[in-house]
């Protein structure tokens, strides 16, 4: 999936860039309104690093999905967290934890083989979001 995201214009941040983004996105623990709705390259500039102007989204690979991790919060901007899961059940658990902490008004999306009905049903029953 990482290869496909890169192909589609994602920019994967290194450790230093992730920390700069954390500090820029949530100074003093609150969402920085200046990043809302801005393109990825402008947010990167605000954080003190450069990305190509055609970068569509900034992605931080993180493992902490608690609310202590700024990437786990809603950012209202083209900045995403990417989590690695052991298996499908672990991925659903991570998603549930994020939605539970962030609020049910959000959207959840599952990309899977349409023949995997048990996965689709588990995802739909577990994640209580406004839009599935």
Where in the sequence are the language-model features?
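ALDH superfamily catalytic-core signature
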Residues: 1-66, 91-93
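Conserved C-terminal structural/oligomerization subdomain of aldehyde/semialdehyde dehydrogenase
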Residues: 49-132
């Amino acid at each position: 999936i990482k290869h496909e995201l890169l192909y589609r214009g994602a920019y994967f941040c290194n450790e230093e860039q992730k920390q700069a983004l954390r500090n820029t996105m949530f100074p003093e623990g609150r969402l920085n309104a200046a990043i809302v709705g801005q393109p990825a390259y402008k947010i990167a500039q605000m954080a003190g690093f450069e990305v190509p102007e055609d970068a569509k989204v900034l992605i931080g690979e993180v493992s902490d999905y608690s609310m202590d991790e700024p990437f786990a919060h809603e950012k209202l901007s083209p900045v995403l967290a990417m989590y690695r899961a052991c298996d499908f059940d672990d991925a659903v658990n991570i998603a549930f934890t994020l939605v539970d902490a962030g609020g049910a008004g959000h959207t959840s999306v599952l990309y899977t083989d349409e023949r995997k009905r048990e996965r689709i049903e588990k995802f739909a029953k577990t994640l209580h979001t406004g839009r599935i």
